[in-house]
Amino acid sequence: MKYISVILTAIFLSTSASGALTVSRDYETEILGNWICKDLWPGYSAFEMIRYKKDGTWNSFGEVIVDFELEEDNYLKVRYGAVGTGIWEIQDDNLISMIDYVKVTNRNHSWLDEYFNMQDQFSLNDKTSEEIVVLSDNYINLKPNTGKGYECYKVKL
């Protein structure tokens, strides 16, 4: 009988301890606010200020810098300004978002728009999923299902 009570106590303590280690995340609340994000690739940089709001919408503005190769080892650095709005939600530790409006403006080589329109690179009304790799009070690391991850830092305005 003594052994049974020891085993039952061990099982009880084991389940209590494992329950205490389980962290319940409220991503919907933690993600609210203003974030500065950066996404860097060779020949591509994006910087964005995005605000996630309680009503499930977001708005953002930022800059995209792209190095277009004109000929071998000769690149043209093109700067684009962008503003956008959309909706967001959390599903299974993933940030699901959709762009419903975007405006992209070529800031320094507008003649290039005749050959390449950056605005066409953004899909409207298509949901995208990004895995929330890390989310803390002031930092988030997201990994899109289509590529490498990027990071954002929370800012107070």
Task: Describe the predicted segments one by one.
Residues 17-85, 96-157:
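Lipid interaction determinants
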Residues 3-13:
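Sec-dependent N-terminal signal peptides
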